[in-house]
Every structure is written in structure tokens, then in C-alpha cells.
Amino acid sequence: MGMVITIDGPAASGKSSVSRELARRLGWQWVSTGAFYRGLAFAALQLQIDLDDVSTLASLTHDPVWSVKMDDERTRVFFKDQDVTDQIAHEDVGNFASKVSHYPEVRKALLDAQRNCSAGPQGLVAEGRDCGTVVFPTAEAKVYLTANSEHRAARRAAELGLDHEDMVKAQQQRDLQDSTRKVAPMAVPEDALVVDTTALNLNQVVDAVVEYVKNKI
């Protein structure tokens, strides 16, 4: 495997946009590890599997009824051979995904799948909430993106067409769940480059990350 760069951070901090553009500039592979949890959550919701049915959820991680595939533009999720990538962005899917991520049995199964993502000869850009701390703890370069909660809520509300105040509350709850879960809580990786994206545009953030990566190569 080539070099691995991890990009972590809370929801709507800019992880996906930055990771995708960074991978494009470098000519590397890009994977969103969160897509695995959202894909599982979407499948569970479609199959009406109860959130508390841990054994069935763990078994579903290996069920071919859903799958994750990477291409040059995004990490795609398929359910019954249909591309549902846009649908997994919905808040109900994200909330379900955050809750099932607390289960060690589910995390272990999906962790194996995430680590099996193939990197090209140059490298892999891996984006998520625990890439630098859990999925790829020995990655050569680690980045943590953050932004104030109001700014993140505004981004997410505009993206999904939802009420801003409702989104603020939803994201605060999601951040609490992700940062306090007993298994692999969201945290800033040791020695990571921390970038506050609140007042920066996409190119400014990517430029900063590229300079950081150059010093690691």
C-alpha cells in the first residue's frame, strides 16, 4: 500500500470536499469510511432491522445486499444493486449510523472492510471520524478539520434544505454521541495538523493540507 493520509473531523467540517479535492490533486485514491456506517444504516432501515438487534446488525455487515465501491469522484453505496449514495446523506441515516457505531461487533466487521480499501501505488486519502486514531493509526500524515457549530450547521442545513436551528441541535447531539462513545470515540489524532475551516474556502484548506503532506513525503 502507498502512503495514507487521514482526514478526520465532525459533521460538516468539510472533510468530504477537502478529501476529494486533495485526492484529485495528488492523483490518489479516496475513501469515505463513514460511508460504510451509513451504508449499513441505510440497509438496516430498509430491511426494518431494529437498532437494538446487535447480532442481526453485525451479520448485516457481511450481507451482499449492500456494498461500498470507490471511484474517482466519491465513495458509492449500493443497496440491492441500486446506487443509494445520495440517500445515505439524509439525517435519519446519519443518526442511525452514529448509534450503530457504538457496537463493538459492528465496528470490528466494518473496520476490516475499511482497511481492505486498496490504495493506488501513490497513496490513499481516508476520510472519517476515527481514521487517524483507529482505522489507520500508523498513517504517515493525519489531518483534523474543525469549524464552529453554527457554521457547520449552516453548511449542513443548506446542503439538505433543512431548518438551521433544528440542524444545530441535531449536530450537537451527533457530536456528543461521536465524542463520548466507549468504542473509538471521535478525537484529534496525535501529531495531526488541525485546521479550522470556519473562515476558509475549499482551496485555502486544501492548499494548507498539501503543504503539510509535502513535508511528510
Curated annotation (Swiss-Prot):
<dbReference type="GO" id="GO:0005524">
    <property type="term" value="F:ATP binding"/>
</dbReference>
<dbReference type="InterPro" id="IPR011994">
    <property type="entry name" value="Cytidylate_kinase_dom"/>
</dbReference>
<dbReference type="GO" id="GO:0006220">
    <property type="term" value="P:pyrimidine nucleotide metabolic process"/>
</dbReference>
<dbReference type="InterPro" id="IPR027417">
    <property type="entry name" value="P-loop_NTPase"/>
</dbReference>
<keyword id="KW-0547">Nucleotide-binding</keyword>
<dbReference type="GO" id="GO:0005829">
    <property type="term" value="C:cytosol"/>
</dbReference>
<dbReference type="GO" id="GO:0036431">
    <property type="term" value="F:dCMP kinase activity"/>
</dbReference>
<dbReference type="GO" id="GO:0036430">
    <property type="term" value="F:CMP kinase activity"/>
</dbReference>
<dbReference type="InterPro" id="IPR003136">
    <property type="entry name" value="Cytidylate_kin"/>
</dbReference>
<dbReference type="Pfam" id="PF02224">
    <property type="entry name" value="Cytidylate_kin"/>
</dbReference>
<dbReference type="GO" id="GO:0015949">
    <property type="term" value="P:nucleobase-containing small molecule interconversion"/>
</dbReference>
<protein>
    <recommendedName>
        <fullName>Cytidylate kinase</fullName>
        <ecNumber>2.7.4.25</ecNumber>
    </recommendedName>
</protein>
<feature type="binding site">
    <location>
        <begin position="9"/>
        <end position="17"/>
    </location>
    <ligand>
        <name>ATP</name>
    </ligand>
</feature>
<keyword id="KW-0067">ATP-binding</keyword>
<keyword id="KW-0808">Transferase</keyword>
<keyword id="KW-0418">Kinase</keyword>
<keyword id="KW-0963">Cytoplasm</keyword>
<comment type="similarity">
    <text>Belongs to the cytidylate kinase family. Type 1 subfamily.</text>
</comment>
